[in-house]
Amino acid sequence: MLGREFYSNVSHVEQGERYTVSHHGSTEDTRQGGNDDLQNTPARSNASTDYSTQSLSNQAGMQPAARRTSMVTEGHVARSQQPLTVNTDFFRGTDQPNATPHPQADPARYAYDSHFHPNTEIANFQTPQMHNYHPYHPNLYHHQYPMHNPSPLHHLQQARVGQMIYQTDPANPSGFPQASPSDLSTTSSQSYYHTGRSSPSVSSSTCSSPVELEDLSVPAKTRPADGFTNLQRTTCPDFSIPSTEQCMQELTPRIRPPSAEQQAPSIGASPPQEFSKASVFLCNSELWRKFHEHRTEMIITKQGRRMFPQLVFRLSGLNPAAHYNVFVDMVIADPNSWKFQSGKWVATGKSDGVPRATGIFKHPDSPNTGEHWMRQDIAFSKLKLTNNRGKDSGYLVINSMHIYQPRIHVLDLTGARVLQTHSFPETQFIGVTAYQNTDITQLKIDHNPFAKGFRDNYDSFATRERLSYVASLQEQRNRTKPVQCTAANAIIPSDTTGFPCQTNPTQRSNGQHEGRPLPMKLIRASEPCSSTNLAPACNSGSGMSGDAICSDSAPSSTIRHSPKSIGEREGALPNLGALNNSGHPGSVLDTPPNQSPHGGCERSNEKHTPAHKLGEGLGCGMLECGEIPWLNTPPSVCSSDNSNPDLPSAKRLRISPAGSGSPSVTSGTSLFTSGSSAAPSPPLLTTAPTAHIAPGLDSTLSTEGVVQCSNRSLVMPQPYYGVGGSFAYQNDSHMGYSYMGQTRQGLNLATSAPYYYQQNN
């Protein structure tokens, strides 16, 4: 009777669903379905205190659509019951749409209710602290765990059978529900529930029957002897039962996800919609491509060596207000180890134990705003490569003979902390301890202004073009013959005290030596030839072979003078009468004939004195540009990349000012260095004490470097660059060539050598 009366007020139950309806003092289980969904719960007698249920597996053979109602009371069967909660016991199908909870129900209370969690421990002891307000009836409250002590051990439950536990409300001793609760914060408010229904029966693979538990914290004397009275039966409210998925979704707010600042940046994650991808450009990509054609090599040392070409980037597309970190690292581009064999790089096999990636090198300006990064180019000029793993920050440890790929990373420090990585294939390089490919060495010299060591030791890798050029100069000098000095074609200045027209000091009677040419700077362009000054000098040499260094009027003759490219800058020629107090010349002529002191290969006549002006200054008017060999610099010795005037020239020779084993007439150091591009000041020459020599005697070279002839002295700059057919040069330091006659450290070399020798002291 009660079952029919109750089910008439319950909404339609779908196939395969089970509802557990809890009343004050009773619990009714309803089931609708096939034979496998039936449950037989026998009713117990009034005198019995046993309560038992059978599992679903023991219900086979029951009639379809059979309904049994089990009503458990303490001493009698209640005539009118009032429902408390409705439970689905997780029998709802997955295709069932999520039901909307009742608008009067508290979602948080309903979600965390013990009836909707499969874990008994979580359901009883991890519920949030809130009022025991029932979501469906304003006068009914659920007893929540824990009540006093949050420790689960205090509320350890013991399995018992069919007992009823309740708590009476002091304000309502009759047990009849009030219209509204007197105080929602009252912890001893009236609460009715059946033993075991605080932890509902949940069908699972590990539990075949529900377990009835008793709260030991409630004293036994508070239990009623005759059950409940004066309770009115009410119908089940019309509400939708939430699905299991909805209940589990409402549990997720209990675990707070980490904030955006605490989350680590994920490289593979997609950036947020408001994030714009940064664009990275390689500024010196053309230079990198030149090196990449020959397989770029980078020197690595224990102390650390900087890269050339450098990594220079330009960023765009960043948020100007956001902050970013910019850093680089390097990864192995190829697992093989390489070696340079037969002029090319050959893989030798895979190497084990090599780290795939290096550490990171953060730019010194990091962190900074996007406006700062986009304002200027980002150059990692302080990055150093090393093979010492004990180095601190500022170094990237790489292995030699392996190919590495540099990468640049842009990390957004705000929002989602998105990390962007960019790489350029032309920046790949091989780490070496010494350069293997000569093409890479040449490119380093041509483009790196700090490649000083290669220019100082240039003779160790002299090129074929330069050797052929030196041989051509030797051949031209051998074909030139000196002519008799006359008043008509003399070119020696008249107002110069120490520079007369003279015979060669090294002239011998056997005619094996030729005259040494005077430098171009010793010629006074403003003075014409004077016969009065030339007569004594020419007469003094009449007793010898008669050869002098005056030019013949024949167009085939060549004046063997050093051109303007040997150290003087453009402008007026220096005054030979200008002296200094120390009695030494002020600089050293240390620039080879094929190089300009201004830092570039000479391709135009602007680097030299014009031929027509040179002829006018000499007073003879018979010279042309094509007749001076050093004015015609072959283009083969010029750098292939010399179209850019800003690039420093390559292969300059650095001539040491003086040796360490003998006195020298030079003072100071060389005016030029390997990377210098500034024009030097004109050198100052000094006079020497006058020495008289008898006519007819050979002129000699004094220990002070003064050529004495015909009551006049000539100061000769001791270090001199050039190749002569019969002159002996010596080398006592790096590229330190000097004129013969001085006892200095070094080896006197034969003049027939086709190229210069380098002596390592």
From Swiss-Prot:
Chain intervals with Low complexity compositional bias: 180-191, 198-210, 656-687
Chain residue ranges for the region called Disordered: 1-85, 167-210, 496-515, 545-612, 637-687
GO molecular function list: DNA-binding transcription factor activity, RNA polymerase II-specific; RNA polymerase II cis-regulatory region sequence-specific DNA binding
Localization per record: Nucleus
Sequence ranges of Polar residues compositional bias: 37-61, 167-179, 496-510, 637-646
Role according to the record: Probable transcriptional regulator involved in developmental processes.
Protein name: T-box protein 1
Organism: Patiria pectinifera (Starfish)
